[in-house]
Amino acid sequence: MLRIFLLCPLLFLSACGGSDKRQQVGIESPSTVEDEIESTPDSFDATFADGMTGAVFQHYLKLRTALVNDDGGDAAAAAGNLSESLGEDYPDLKMAATVIAATNDVAAQRAAFGAMTEEIEPLLREGITGGTIYKQHCPMAFDNAGADWFSDAERIRNPYFGDRMLTCGKVVATLE
């Protein structure tokens, strides 16, 4: 009888908690996934007629990457470096870079980045001597007004939405 009395609780515990069937719930977050964090390459395929244009494009890529990663601090630093790299012949481009460098607010930086992209296009178009720069477009940016950006790769990494819509966009032109 004592034996049955001791075995009953053991059977009860093993019956209630001994199941190997476990429900697994996977949570996938579209935000910070290690593989999706964009990085700026140390070099790119495009070559330019002068060192200033190459430096400006490198800082532009770092700025774009910071916006893709929703990193206002890195975006401000890259914009400051871009502004310092510019000559005096590009006051509107320099102003857009200064606006971005003056804040860590990613939404404000993205708005100024759209204006910067419009201003930087003639510099890149006139200065590229080799390789390819991809002009990309997101039709949903700024309440469906759309906005462009430049990239050193054909792969879409959207600076206007970051990880919320990382691959929204398409290549609309190439500069060669």
Model-derived regions, located:
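Amphipathic, charged alpha-helical segments and their helix-to-coil junctions
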Residues: 131-176
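Bacterial signal peptide processing site
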Residues: 16-20
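Sec-dependent bacterial lipoprotein signal peptides
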Residues: 1-14
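N-terminal start-of-chain detector that recognizes signal peptides
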Residues: 35-39, 46, 107-112, 140-141
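Post-signal peptide N-terminal segment of mature Sec-exported envelope proteins
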Residues: 24-48
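Surface-exposed, polar/charged faces of alpha-helical domains
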Residues: 47, 51, 58, 62-84, ...
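Short, intrinsically disordered, charge-biased short linear motifs at domain edges
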Residues: 2, 116, 120-128, 152-157
